[in-house]
Amino acid sequence: MAKHERGLRFQPAGGVKTVQIPAGKKQRLTIERLSDDGRGIAFLEGKTWFVAGSLAGEEVEARVLNARGKVVEARTERVFTASTMRRAPACEYFGRCGGCSVQHVPHEEQLALKQRMLAEQLLRVANVVPDEWAAPLSGAELAYRRRARVAVRWDAKAKRLDVGFRAAASQDIVSIEHCPVLVQALQPIMNELPGMLKNFSKPQALGHVELFSGVATAVLLRHTAPLAEADLALLQAFCSKHGAQLWLHGEGEPQPVSPGDTLGYRLEPWNLQLAWRPGDFIQVNAAVNTAMIEQALQWLAPAKDERVMDLFCGLGNFALPLAGLAREVVAVEGVATMVERAAVNAMSNDLHNVQFFQADLSQPLTHADWAAEGFSTVLLDPPRDGAFEVVRQIRKTGARRLLYVSCNPATLARDTVELISQGYRLKRAGILDMFPQTAHVEAMALFEMSK
């Protein structure tokens, strides 16, 4: 195998060697436009630069994070000529912390960027424009996140405990004591968490910390070795001060220190309460989650005699509100433990017309007993991979209306191609601003069978 000299990448014999740009190098650039993920795009000497923290039309100094072939990833270090659109970020750690990527962009422009990303994916991949664009669903720009994972790492060489969030494009930890996107109930906990953990007698036993806010506030500590009694007492005093439950995650499943403690969240418009456990999926933005459910019910508008299917149902986030409108809801999820908790949630909310089933949603739906009667309406809320295997079978269920909630416009567009081929029409679509200050796009799309 040929040796690789530092800074050079060699092509096979007879090819052309390409000079690679080392990480850390600074370069002055003119930003031409924004990419789909909110980074600025610049072109220089045959290479395309993706520059975090920049805006179209700006002159910036960028520091290289990574370079591969003709693509360079970088972050803004200095702005020589600022866009009139630029605003001061709300967070002092912006640009270093990897959590937020577009705090320098006004919120209305963030929404426009996300709308454009969705529209471009649908047009480019599926060659379709919805009959109607819905207004973006959004809530507060800041103080919206009710769940967060805080990275913790003991640096034995430096004898230092790092507590914070992962850096942008890196596994490094940015030490953080304040995060403006966390809900208010978690702010004082986050402010004092690093100082408390640094008093541990055995910091090398610390893994990570998760913070939760809902019906109750909770702190979960992942630990890789048994905790010293003094350290456990420190944790308990900290949680008591902040009125938070304490959960520990050593070997096995996470458990509350007080056996009676439980976690849950409210869906106030329907007077529902859903229980959940660490490891379960819940939407981190409570306000947008509620607005999303309200919009889904309005778009689907199931009649009282209809049978509705909810696929990738999780804990019943959509299924339980739907049960208040339809004759019957059949909800299907791949994770067995979440199916069990969803069924308990239905019973605890006195809902008896919703059934939950565990199934591999990559397999034919029509082979299952619960699918035998068919459905007039289907709701999908798949993971980022989308629901291609499911949508290939949707027409066999008899569904006239299908609501697709997506956390990835690329797979939504791909699945739209299949739905159109089956005779469905894209009636309405819009973005869900579940993660303000980031370029992450969630969307809702309504399909109806063409007449």
Swiss-Prot record:
**Record: residues binding S-adenosyl-L-methionine:** Q283, F312, N317, E333, D360, D381
Q: Where, by residue number, is the active site?
A: C407
Q: Per the UniProt record, which EC number(s) apply here? A: 2.1.1.190
The yes or no answer to whether the keyword Protein biosynthesis is present is: no
| Catalytic activity of the protein | uridine(1939) in 23S rRNA + S-adenosyl-L-methionine = 5-methyluridine(1939) in 23S rRNA + S-adenosyl-L-homocysteine + H(+)
Boundaries of each TRAM domain copy? 20-78
Listed binding positions for [4Fe-4S] cluster are C91, C97, C100, C179
Among the Pfam families in the record, one is TRAM
Which GO-annotated molecular functions does the record name? Answer: 4 iron, 4 sulfur cluster binding; iron ion binding; RNA binding; rRNA (uridine-C5-)-methyltransferase activity
Can the keyword Endoplasmic reticulum be found in this entry's annotation?
Answer: no
**Mind telling me which SUPFAM superfamilies this protein's record contains?**
Nucleic acid-binding proteins (SSF50249), S-adenosyl-L-methionine-dependent methyltransferases (SSF53335)
This molecule's function is given as: Catalyzes the formation of 5-methyl-uridine at position 1939 (m5U1939) in 23S rRNA.
* Entries under NCBIfam families matching the protein: PRK13168.1, rumA
Please report the name of this protein according to its UniProt entry: 23S rRNA (uracil(1939)-C(5))-methyltransferase RlmD
Q: Which organism is it from?
A: Pseudomonas savastanoi pv. phaseolicola (strain 1448A / Race 6)
State the encoding gene: rlmD
